[in-house]
Design a protein with these regions (language model features):
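Glycine- and acidic
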Residues: 1, 18-27, 56-58, 102-108, ...
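Short glycine/threonine-rich loop-to-helix capping motif typified by GTGT followed
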Residues: 27-40, 66-71, 98-99, 148-151
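Active-site adenylate/phosphate-handling loop in enzymes that bind or generate adenylated species
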Residues: 44, 79, 103-166
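Beta-sheet entry/capping signal
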Residues: 22-24, 53-55, 82, 130-133
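A conserved beta-strand->alpha-helix junction
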Residues: 49, 53-109, 115, 141
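A glycine-rich phosphate-binding loop feature that marks nucleotide/adenosyl-phosphate handling sites
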Residues: 21-33, 89-92, 138-140
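RNA-binding accessory domains that recognize and position tRNA/RNA substrates
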Residues: 1-26, 42-52
Length: 166
């Protein structure tokens, strides 16, 4: 509970400092994006900003399971945030064609291209909405470098950056 309060207080300070009334998050259905979404909703509630101003986006890709996608959508609906679904499959497949990468080769190019496409979507929607991209990566991922450069390591405010994955 104390960690949630610290995260919420930090996000509130940032939102107030830049006079921001909207947030954009990529929601995967995993622990990190769930925590980031909960903190964002708590911050918006404390600021009296409608939850609809929190834009949660699930971005199914080439390896997305029904379970994680369902978890993401269910969580966003229960919390009453704006829910969007944008598939990255067509864009990533086109990218693979453009660079000559075989999509059957599931290497770092395969994984990282999807993360980068998702980040581009989040940044573009934040620009459209005059919102803040809330990062979901945690301290353990940042410390170990377990993220995609120009992908999920990028955000406008990394709300989980001080929280280890435990």
């Amino acid at each position: 509970k104390e960690i949630l309060q610290i995260q919420t207080t930090g996000l509130i300070a940032r939102l107030e400092h830049i006079n921001c009334k909207k947030a954009v998050l990529g929601i995967s259905g995993g622990l990190d994006s769930t925590l980031a979404l909960l903190v964002t909703v708590m911050a918006f509630d404390k600021l009296g900003i409608p939850r609809e101003n929190v834009i949660g986006i699930t971005m199914p890709g080439l390896g997305t399971t029904h379970r994680t996608k369902s978890n993401a959508v269910d969580l966003m609906e229960v919390l009453g945030v704006t829910t969007r679904e944008i598939s990255v499959v067509a864009a990533v497949e086109q990218h693979f064609k453009d660079i000559g990468h075989d999509p059957k080769v599931m290497d770092s190019t395969y994984e990282n291209a999807q993360a980068r496409e998702r980040t581009q979507i989040l940044m573009d929607i934040a620009n459209q909405e005059n919102g803040l991209v809330i990062g979901t990566g945690d301290l353990s991922e940042l410390a170990l470098g377990w993220c995609t450069y120009n992908g999920d390591h990028m955000s406008m405010y990394a709300v989980n950056a001080s929280v280890p994955k435990t």
